[in-house]
Amino acid sequence: SIAELYDMQHEPDTRELLVCHSEEVGQEVGRAFQIPRTADDLRLKREAYFAWAQANCGMVGRSPDFLNVMLAALAAKKSFFAEDSAERANNVFEYYRFVARNDLFMTHALLDPQLDKGKLRNEQSDPAICLQVVDENENGIVLSGIKRIATAAPYADELLVWPFPPTFQR
């Protein structure tokens, strides 16, 4: 089960492999959150992923590490986000720290609904069905519409929603 994978991070036989200290977060975190700096860091990450895969016989398609790795990669490239906005770069990095600090399970919602698969999002008979920002105010953004394919949504702590694939271009 998912809980058993998290429990492995506290078991004496697997803790050292599955948990490491993160300078970015300032505490111990699950190995998937580690931003690797050496070949040995990468080797340990691979071994940690393999240990979780072995523990569930490879039968958990969306284990907690799958998006944690992606979030660590985004945090590692904070400079990329800073090219557009220092605030955005800080938000990405602080979100990584929040998720890592709390060892949260994330999933994602990727795709727009398609009423007609031969048409792009803006060409659909009802393009408003697709998730979109309809307002921005002091509290953040206001969304309307839907995204689909959120595989681990029933048991995830956090849901990442992003514009994938590009939906206004051919």
PLM regions with names:
Residues 1, 141-144, 170:
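Intrinsic structural disorder
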Residues 19, 28, 128-132, 163-166:
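Short, surface-exposed linear patches
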